[in-house]
């Protein structure tokens, strides 16, 4: 289970150091293998490989009218491995798609992660908070 936010930096080659608190879980759950793909909100999704296989099966089963979504998720997916220093390489294509340059935010989302450009994430978070609680959360107790 992945949760929490980590402010990270991409190096000049596009490598990101995975926080130590997630490395052991990724090694145990997925032998350090992850899959990275686009998300329609403008970030990237990072899945441990077993979780990716579950997600991939759901996407592949979508009806024909969702063929563009299959292209977005599956056609842009890249398999990567944690290196000996606990880093993953984010491809230039995926960095460009998500507007990632240097400062990024890694969010644990339960079974997977989202990777955002820090400025984009902060702006979207502020906009969401300014809109107030959605109806789905009106009766939710904190």
UniProtKB/Swiss-Prot annotation:
Single GO BP term: negative regulation of DNA-templated transcription initiation
InterPro entries: MraZ, MraZ_C, MraZ_dom, MraZ_N, MraZ_sf, SpoVT-AbrB_dom, SpoVT-AbrB_sf
Keywords: Cytoplasm, DNA-binding, Repeat, Transcription, Transcription regulation
Molecular-function annotations in GO: DNA-binding transcription factor activity; transcription cis-regulatory region binding
Chief site of localization: cytoplasm
Compartments, record wording: Cytoplasm, Nucleoid
Gene3D superfamilies assigned: Transcriptional regulator MraZ domain (3.40.1550.20)
Keyword S-adenosyl-L-methionine: no
GO CC, alphabetical: cytoplasm; nucleoid
Pfam families the UniProt entry points to: MraZ
Domain SpoVT-AbrB: from-to ranges: 5-51, 77-120
Subunit structure: Forms oligomers.
Family note: Belongs to the MraZ family.
Protein name: Transcriptional regulator MraZ
Gene for this chain: mraZ
């Amino acid at each position: 289970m992945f949760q929490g936010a980590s402010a990270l930096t991409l190096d000049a080659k596009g490598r990101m150091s995975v926080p130590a608190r997630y490395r052991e879980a990724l090694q145990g759950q997925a032998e350090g293998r992850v899959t990275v793909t686009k998300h329609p909100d403008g970030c990237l999704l990072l899945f441990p490989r077993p979780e990716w296989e579950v997600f991939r099966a759901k996407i592949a089963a979508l009806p024909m009218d969702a063929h563009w979504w299959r292209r977005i998720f599956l056609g842009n997916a890249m398999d990567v491995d944690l290196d000996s220093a606990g880093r993953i390489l984010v491809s230039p294509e995926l960095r460009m798609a998500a507007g990632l340059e240097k400062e990024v935010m890694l969010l644990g989302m339960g079974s997977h992660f989202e990777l955002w450009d820090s400025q984009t994430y902060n702006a979207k978070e502020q906009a969401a908070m300014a809109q107030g609680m959605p109806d789905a959360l009106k009766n939710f107790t904190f």
